[in-house]
């Protein structure tokens, strides 16, 4: 399994596009961990709609480390919220 760890703080503008691009992946054996640095916008609500595991984080190393600590996957993929992946990205990478 792949653990996708996303570091966020007030990312409501970008996060939906990233999470949609993850959902649309051909590769499906993953979990999404959102390591959030106390967002005050809709970031958490958006992540909940995509069934992300939400944890307290920080920017950037604390958030990445916190995400890695709870990850269940054998592989870790760290992403920023403004990333969008083509549908075959995980299939070709993992």
Predicted regions and their residues:
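Conserved short acidic donor-positioning loop in nucleotide-sugar-dependent glycosyltransferases
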Residues: 22, 36-38, 58
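Short aromatic/hydrophobic "clamp" motif used to bind/position activated sugar donors
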Residues: 76
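Hydrophobic/aromatic residue at the end of a short beta strand that borders the catalytic acidic motif
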Residues: 79, 83-89
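Glycine-rich, basic loop-to-helix element that forms the pyrophosphate-binding segment
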Residues: 56-71
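A short, amphipathic alpha-helix embedded in the catalytic core of nucleotide-handling enzymes
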Residues: 22, 89-94
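A conserved acidic beta->alpha catalytic loop
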Residues: 36-44, 83
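Short, acidic, metal-binding catalytic loop of nucleotide-sugar glycosyltransferases
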Residues: 20-29
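N-proximal low-complexity "stem/linker" segments adjacent to membrane-targeting elements
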Residues: 1-21
